[in-house]
Amino acid sequence: MDFDSSNLSLDCLIYIFSFLDEDDLIRASEVCKFWHEAAVTPWLWRQMCLQQWTFCNVARSESGKGSWRSYFLRRARLERRMETGRSGADYTCRSLRGHTGSVVGLVYLAGSDADISSSASVVCSASTDGTVRAWDVQQGTQLWATPAQSALCDITVDTKLGTLFTSDTAGKISAWEGLSGREVASFSTSSSGCKLLAYSVENQSVLMAGTGGGALHTLTSPSLTQLSRHMLFDTFKINQLISSPDRKWLFVGAQECIDTSPKVFFSESLSCPSEDEPPLRQSLPVSDCCAAAFLPADPARLVLIHNTENRGYSTLSVFNISMKKSKYQVDILVQQVETFQLEFGGRRPDVLLQTQGSDTLVVAVGNRLRVYTLKGVVLASFEDHTQPIAALCVDSFRVVTASRDLSLRVLTWKKEKDKGRTLQSRFHLLGGSHTMSRGFTKVACDYVSIVASVQSVNGKDVLKAYSFNS
């Protein structure tokens, strides 16, 4: 007996369609007008979006006029292209040239995320040629360049204010307007090679600057007025400045000072200093720290890779950071909650550490990439490169490794019933000729693009921009 769907109500048909995947749902919408009405129901596509992705903001897509259906189809199509990585069909590669020195850092001034389909990606790069340059990633064009000054050492961005900050070898910190590249403020530290970190705490934007002499400056953003200065590592360079995702905690370390413990600060005590009391800080019970990262979904947890006293092997330790209040004072409490030994032996200053979620750790050393749980269980291991991994970029969708072998490797997260979150290696992105370059040195990503710096043989580094087609 033939089935007559006209006997079904619209609600019944929508319920039946809720068991279909996107391809079947699209085919069902083409059967007849009644089926089309059911198949394009926003509730169906909203459910599919929320099952596929943790967070969706359809109101931000397509200037706020998008539907759940168009949102799902666009995002799913883009992610399929980011998984297959076919040159020309899935992405466009452009070379960004203009620097006459080495690229020391690159940051996204404006990036595209999963909810915005039409916004342009703008990357800014700093170089030893003394300039900052802004690039349109999709068009492959330079938007502006600052006048040359002393060789630059570092760059960071306050995306909320649209302001860039750089430090140079003469000890000068500069603030640049993101739209024009105009210098809006400067501050002299009298110390070369400052490490920079911009962030907002309690609705106040600040810039942290760690100097080559071991001092930590807290400056207002973007005016660069000094709020506080503290000497932390006498004569040793501060080269680790990391803020927790909720901006409550600040990690400060000096890799060269192997016998001194890194520090963790209560951020508000630096940005809103008290005349009567020193900032709240605590030394961590480790030394010779090679890498550090907070957990995105558990911002009070800090992960450190450090060397043991006998320097025989490296250890990964996880600490919980909290406030301990008594009647007369407030202290920072640091508690070790996990620790395990890593497979590589000896001191490895080249180790890279990134985190994802509340319990996933990504560690790169040499040409090897490994994914761990907080308990030290290895979820995945890769050796896709023939030379060391120089830089690492991790987000909720993928991991990108940049290697001295002049290739990028793209890996995507995958959920498995038995293992939970794991990583799947996808494809290589090549960087050009080995005769003209010495490999990739840095990498940055937004949702629709990847930008990496190539160290050139002639000293004029080039950026490679990979823009995925939506």
What do these predicted regions represent?
Residues M1-S6, L10-S18, D23-T141, K324-E343, ...:
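Intrinsically disordered, low-complexity acidic/Ser/Thr/Pro-rich linker and tail segments
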Residues C56, R77-G98, T141-D154, R182-A198, ...:
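Inter-blade linker and blade-boundary elements of WD-repeat/beta-propeller domains
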Residues L106, V132-D136, I173-E177, L216-T220, ...:
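WD40-repeat beta-propellers
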Residues V107-A120, T156-L161, A198-S205, I242-K248, ...:
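Loop/turn segments within WD40 beta-propeller blades
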Residues D115-S117, V123-S127, L164-D168, L207-G210, ...:
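Conserved beta-strand element within WD40/beta-propeller blades
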Residues R133-S223, L227:
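A generic tandem-repeat structural signature
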Residues Q387, A391-L392, R398-S470:
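C-terminal interaction modules of eukaryotic adaptor/scaffold proteins
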